[in-house]
UniProtKB/Swiss-Prot annotation:
The name this protein goes by in its record: Large ribosomal subunit protein uL15
Subunit organization: Part of the 50S ribosomal subunit.
GO cellular component terms listed in the entry, alphabetical order: cytosolic large ribosomal subunit
Keyword RNA-binding: yes
Gene: rplO
InterPro entries: Ribosomal_uL15, Ribosomal_uL15/eL18, Ribosomal_uL15/eL18_sf, Ribosomal_uL15_bac-type, Ribosomal_uL15_CS
Keyword entries, A-Z: Ribonucleoprotein, Ribosomal protein, RNA-binding, rRNA-binding
Known function: Binds to the 23S rRNA.
GO molecular function, one term: structural constituent of ribosome
UniProt biased composition (Gly residues): 19-33
Length: 145
């Protein structure tokens, strides 16, 4: 097991360049004669050989409002039904305890996927219309925070 040999040709020998004409890769080291690709460094990303690059030829367009975008943690009624008991309060802290949301999301939106059979009270940011009608039908209370 520990003295097995690799099959012939399994590992290639490293190419050693610039060590005289007898090696086959001496003098120019397989880079050809002169020019940009024969030199030491490669041009930066987006460089077009002195021509005005595409990113400078085209105008800037649009803007992003992503810094101020409100992101809601989405929780389904089915998940709440699995993790909560009758009479419990569904809010940021209890959802975090039950690992239904991640810490970074402060705003919560409830959606109507799944069935809710337990009578719980909600303290959330938003709730969908279909989820609201299902929750009210059961007799749960909703408080928008």
């Amino acid at each position: 097991m520990f003295n097995l040999l690799k099959p012939k040709g399994a590992s290639k020998r490293r190419k050693i360049v610039g060590r005289g004409p007898g090696s086959g890769l001496g003098k120019t080291s397989g880079r050809g004669q002169k020019g940009q690709k024969a030199r030491n460094t490669s041009p930066r990303l987006g460089f077009e050989g002195g021509q005005t690059p595409l990113y400078r030829r085209l105008p800037r367009k649009g803007f992003s409002n992503s810094d101020y975008k409100l992101e809601y943690a989405i929780v389904n009624l089915g998940d709440i039904d699995k993790k909560f008991k009758d009479g419990q309060v569904v809010n940021y802290d209890t959802l975090l305890e039950n690992k239904l949301i991640k810490k970074k999301n402060k705003k919560i939106k409830i959606l109507s996927n799944g069935k809710l059979t337990k009578k719980v009270s909600f303290e959330v940011s938003k709730i969908s219309k279909s989820a609201e009608s299902l929750v009210i039908k059961i007799g749960c209370t909703i408080q928008l925070v």
